[in-house]
Each structure stands twice: as structure tokens, then as C-alpha cells.
């Protein structure tokens, strides 16, 4: 005879946690809103306003992720309770083991939804921009910046996010001086917001003929895309707009006209730039969107000084504000805020960042 009380206790625990989550996530209101959104998307003229239709589609995906999961949990707990009763009635150990396996699946699903409670910020659900900036140190630092770009692109791909490289300035010899990546998907900013800070690399440099150990720094700065209806006042007189040719390694796709755009907000010295389109007009629009987002984040940082990771703006990065150390010679990567550490350095550089990100979110950083 198998022991059923621990399984009953697990079912009860999952049911109680589901009920708490149902209330916290306002399930009833979200279910009602989902029905409204679905009805709007079924209207034949919805695509007459493409931006609104896209916004509704995105809202539907976000609502479904919560409503459908809670529905699946409720149905799953009902099914597993019936399965346990069947196992007891027939004294069937295989069915009993199946009950435990199903509970593992439900617990994992519930855990993922509970983790969403970490995303309570106003813009946690938004798309975001990630700026990577090489520190001083020449080619070694610029190579490190390009490694970070690759790492975050791999991470985003594994999470199912879409990415766009908005701007990338090549290094003098190798690597990247700076890059801006747009990350598109549910809770992109929520996932990445604790990655803002300085990343330190220690390794034997492939650019040093003597094979000596070098320490390099590059920074990451994450800020949410701001809705157009958020009122961010920008005085045109405060802007300096420069146009230039997009950089690149050559070939038929190199832009031969001055279509790349750089915008400097003079009062704050915040700079945005875009070169990913052949149209100067489109690049300017994108750079203005980034500027609006950066100014919003800048204001939020001033209002929430205790949570401020950066000082004033990205250009004033303090190289002491390190968040993570990557010591490749010793095969050790350590988060300096949470103490989370791993020796699988290649996996991290290939985008396996969740252990660090989840720990920082749970720590309330």
C-alpha cells in the first residue's frame, strides 16, 4: 500500500497557492478583459488601425498567459484528485506514480506564474532597450562589449523574445564600441531590469602577444519602451540632431547616404542613435522613441533614488558599480550582489543567465 497523505497535502498546498495567485493577479477582471479583447479582434475593421490591432494582439497574449495558466491549474488539480482516488480504489501503483508526476508538472507551472509576481513595476511588462557600452581598455574592452551583445541576444532568443539591433558601432580593431538592442516580448523589461550595471571580465587577452591577464569593463543599461500616451515633454531647442553614414564592414548593404541619426538631449547629455534603416526619417523616429524612453527612466531614477543603479545618466557610469564578475581563467562567474556563482562560464556567455536574473529579482534589486 502506498502513502497517500503526502500527495493529498501537495494537492491541498497547490490549491491554496493557486487561490492566492488567482486573487493577486485579479483573474476575474483579466478573464473579462480577455473576452473584450477577443471580441474587438474579431471585428472585421480592426486592421484599419494596425497599431491598435497590434496592441490588442499583444494585450491578448499577456492576458492569455495568466488566464489560461490559472484555468489549466484548476483543471489539472481536479484531474489529479480524480487520478489519486482511482489509484486508491484500484490499489494501482502505476496510477499513483502518474499522480505524483502530474503534480510535478502543475507545481512547475504554478511556480512560473508565481515568479511573475516579481514583475510588479509599472513598465515590467513592456518591451525594452539594452545599451551596451565598452569601457576604457581599447580592443580588449571592445571585444568584451561584443561578447555581451552576443550573450544577451542568445538569452533573448532562448526566452522567445524578438530582438532588433538598433545601433552598433564597430570597435577600432575588433569588437564593439557601443550597441543598442531592442528586446520585444512580454515582460522583457521586467526580466532584464536588474542587468543594468558594470560587467567585469578577467582573462588572458587574445590581443596580447605576451598572453598576459587583462581586466576589462563594459556596461549594460536597460530601460523600458514608453507608450506614446505617456507625456514626456521634449523641447526641440534642447536637442542636437546629427546625421552620419552608418558604420559597417563593407559590402553592398553598407549605407552610402547619411541616414544614421544621433540625437543629444543637451540638458541631460542623454544620447540616442539609430542606423538600422535606410530611411533617415525612420531612424530619427526610432531615436526619438529611445530618447523618450531614456528620459522617462531618467526621471524615474531621480524619483526612486534608493533603487537607482545608475547615476544621473548612462554616460556617467561609475566603473565601481559592478554587478557581475567573469573570471574566465578560473572558470568562475559571480554575481556581486546576490553571491550566485557558476563555473560553467561558456554556458553563461551563450546566454544562460536565468539563475542570475531570478536571484536578483527575488532579492528585490
Curated annotation (Swiss-Prot):
Keyword annotations: Cytoplasm, Methylation, Protein biosynthesis
Domain of life: Bacteria
Compartment list: Cytoplasm
Coiled-coil positions: none
Chain positions with N5-methylglutamine modification: 252
Gene3D superfamilies the UniProt entry points to: 3.30.160.20, 3.30.70.1660, Release factor
Post-translational note: Methylated by PrmC. Methylation increases the termination efficiency of RF2.
Similarity comment text for this entry: Belongs to the prokaryotic/mitochondrial release factor family.
Function: Peptide chain release factor 2 directs the termination of translation in response to the peptide chain termination codons UGA and UAA.
UniProt-listed HAMAP family: Rel_fac_2
Protein name as annotated: Peptide chain release factor 2
UniProt source species: Pectobacterium atrosepticum (strain SCRI 1043 / ATCC BAA-672)
Amino acid at each position: 500500500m502506498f502513502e497517500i497523505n503526502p500527495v493529498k497535502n501537495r494537492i491541498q498546498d497547490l490549491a491554496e497557492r493557486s487561490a492566492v495567485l488567482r486573487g493577486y493577479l485579479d483573474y476575474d477582471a483579466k478573464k473579462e478583459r480577455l473576452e473584450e479583447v477577443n471580441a474587438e479582434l474579431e471585428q472585421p475593421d480592426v486592421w484599419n488601425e494596425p497599431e491598435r490591432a497590434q496592441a490588442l494582439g499583444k494585450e491578448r497574449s499577456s492576458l492569455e498567459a495568466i488566464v489560461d495558466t490559472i484555468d489549466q491549474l484548476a483543471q489539472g488539480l481536479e484531474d489529479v484528485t480524480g487520478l489519486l482516488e482511482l489509484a486508491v480504489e484500484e490499489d494501482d501503483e502505476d496510477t499513483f506514480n502518474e499522480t505524483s508526476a502530474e503534480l510535478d508538472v502543475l507545481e512547475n507551472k504554478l511556480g512560473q506564474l508565481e515568479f511573475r509576481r516579481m514583475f510588479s513595476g509599472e513598465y515590467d511588462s513592456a518591451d525594452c532597450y539594452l545599451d551596451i557600452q565598452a569601457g576604457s581598455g581599447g580592443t580588449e574592452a571592445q571585444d568584451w562589449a561584443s561578447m555581451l551583445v552576443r550573450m544577451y541576444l542568445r538569452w533573448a532568443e532562448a526566452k522567445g523574445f524578438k530582438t532588433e539591433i538598433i545601433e552598433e558601432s564597430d570597435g577600432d580593431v575588433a569588437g564593439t564600441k557601443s550597441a543598442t538592442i531592442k528586446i520585444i516580448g512580454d515582460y522583457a523589461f521586467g526580466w532584464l531590469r536588474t542587468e543594468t550595471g558594470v560587467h567585469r571580465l578577467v582573462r588572458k587577452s587574445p590581443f596580447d602577444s605576451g598572453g598576459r591577464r587583462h581586466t576589462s569593463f563594459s556596461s549594460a543599461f536597460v530601460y523600458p519602451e514608453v507608450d506614446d500616451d505617456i507625456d514626456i515633454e521634449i523641447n526641440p531647442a534642447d536637442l542636437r540632431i546629427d546625421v552620419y553614414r552608418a558604420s559597417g564592414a563593407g559590402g553592398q548593404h553598407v549605407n552610402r547616404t547619411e541616414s544614421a541619426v544621433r540625437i543629444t538631449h543637451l540638458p541631460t547629455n542623454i544620447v540616442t542613435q539609430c542606423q538600422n534603416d535606410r530611411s533617415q526619417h525612420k531612424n530619427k523616429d526610432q531615436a526619438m522613441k529611445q530618447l523618450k524612453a531614456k528620459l522617462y527612466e531618467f526621471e524615474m531614477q531621480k524619483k526612486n533614488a534608493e533603487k537607482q543603479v545608475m547615476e544621473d545618466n548612462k554616460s556617467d557610469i561609475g566603473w565601481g558599480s559592478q554587478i557581475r564578475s567573469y573570471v574566465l581563467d578560473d572558470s568562475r562567474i559571480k554575481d556581486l550582489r546576490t553571491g550566485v556563482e557558476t563555473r560553467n562560464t561558456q554556458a553563461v556567455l551563450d546566454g544562460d543567465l536565468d539563475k542570475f536574473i531570478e536571484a536578483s529579482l527575488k532579492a528585490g534589486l
